[in-house]
Every structure is written in C-alpha cells, then in structure tokens.
A protein has these predicted regions:
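A structural boundary/capping signal
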Residues: 1-217
Length: 217
C-alpha cells in the first residue's frame, strides 16, 4: 500500500533536526492524517513511544486548525442531545489524541447501548441508571472519579468509557447519550457545586446523581 510505504519513509525523518525537513514531514503527515491509524496497523513494526510523541507534536497545529473549522458543526443538527453529542465528540477526540476521530465516539456509544439492551432489554430511565452506575454482581460500569476530580481526562469521553471514571458532567452525558439510544429523554440540572441528570419515570420527575451510583432523588 503506497500510504504505508510513505509512512515507513517518513518515520525515518521524525527526529530530523532540520526545520525544513520537519515542515515537509508535517505536511505529508497532515495530508494522510485520517488514514494514519489504518496505516499504522499495517506497519511491520509499530511506532515507538518516541515516534508517536513526535507524530503528535507535528500534527498538533493541523489538529487545532481542524478543531476550529469543524467546531460549529453541531449547530446544524436538530435536537439538543445530538448537538451535545457532536460537540462532546469533537472535544473528546481532540483530547484523546491524533489517532482518534470524532465519529469514533458514536460507535462506542452504540456498542455500549447494544450491550445494555442485550443484558437488560428495553430499560426505563431508572433501570438504565442502575445498569450504568450501580454496583451489580460486584461490577460498577461507571463511577465518580473521586481521586482525580479535576483531571481534564474526565472531559474525554473516550477515556471515561475506557476507565469507567468521570466527573458529574461526563457521567451525566454518558447517561443522556445512551438514554437517547433507548428513546429516553435525559436532561441536565445545574446544582451548586455539582451536576445532576433529570428524568421522568412513571410521570414523576427525578434528579439522578450519576456521580453517586445513579442515586434517584
């Protein structure tokens, strides 16, 4: 594959100290940025941590420019939940690094919703909160990151899904996005020093503390 051959050539120049060479490598990597993860899987030898860091630094300007260009895309979607998911996907992909695309988050959320349906069927808002946040069989899928509450990683939903840790806002977002795939209306509620989800079950409105095991109040 031509792209893989080109990448093999470029990786030999990643540590070149010439600014002219670095600019040329940056342009080539930027041009193939969306295909890079696929090309990496086809390399005979994976990139070393040092090479990955070099690629990240070279792609950083292009990633920032792209973020600025696509940021307002969410405004053209219908509905507050799709808008929020698009904006969150963009932020999370930027935080997650150059290998990640915004569209990857929707795929992970689809997978999570499919697992929830396979295990719990068509759950209501209370049942879904329990599935996501309560301890069941010794397993808690998502819980509050009490040890590192202010870490920026809590705003990266790729990291939150991978680790099961998050802050109130990111955990409520997970609940809202999965709920939307179940046909549930999950809103948000600002609270002094906190953030809660808002749902209706059997005609009654509830506040849900996703950071505290999905407690209904």
């Amino acid at each position: 594959m031509p792209g893989v051959l080109q990448l093999n050539h470029l990786r030999k120049l990643l540590d070149d100290e010439s600014e002219v060479v670095r600019d040329a490598v940056r342009r080539e990597l930027t041009g193939m940025r969306r295909e890079l993860p696929q090309f990496l899987e086809l390399l005979d030898e994976p990139l070393t941590p040092e090479e990955e860091q070099a690629v990240a630094e070279l792609l950083e300007p292009a990633r920032r420019t792209e973020m600025e260009e696509i940021w307002m895309r969410w405004r053209w979607l219908e509905g507050s939940t799709p808008q929020l998911e698009e904006a969150t996907s963009q932020i999370s992909a930027f935080l997650d690094g150059w290998k990640t695309q915004p569209g990857d988050l929707g795929l992970q959320l689809d997978t999570l919703a499919r697992v929830a349906f396979e295990e719990g069927g068509r759950m209501n808002a209370h049942e879904l909160a329990e599935w996501l946040f309560a301890q069941r069989g010794g397993i808690t899928r998502f819980r509050g990151n009490t040890k590192d509450y202010y870490s920026p990683l809590n705003s990266n939903l790729f990291w939150v899904i991978e680790t099961g840790l998050g802050n109130p806002l990111s955990l409520c977002s997970i609940y809202r996005f999965i709920g939307q795939r179940f046909g549930l209306d999950v809103g948000g509620c600002n609270f002094p020093g906190h953030f809660l989800a808002r749902v209706q079950v059997d005609g009654k409105e509830w506040l849900v503390d996703c950071f505290n095991r999905g407690k209904f109040m």
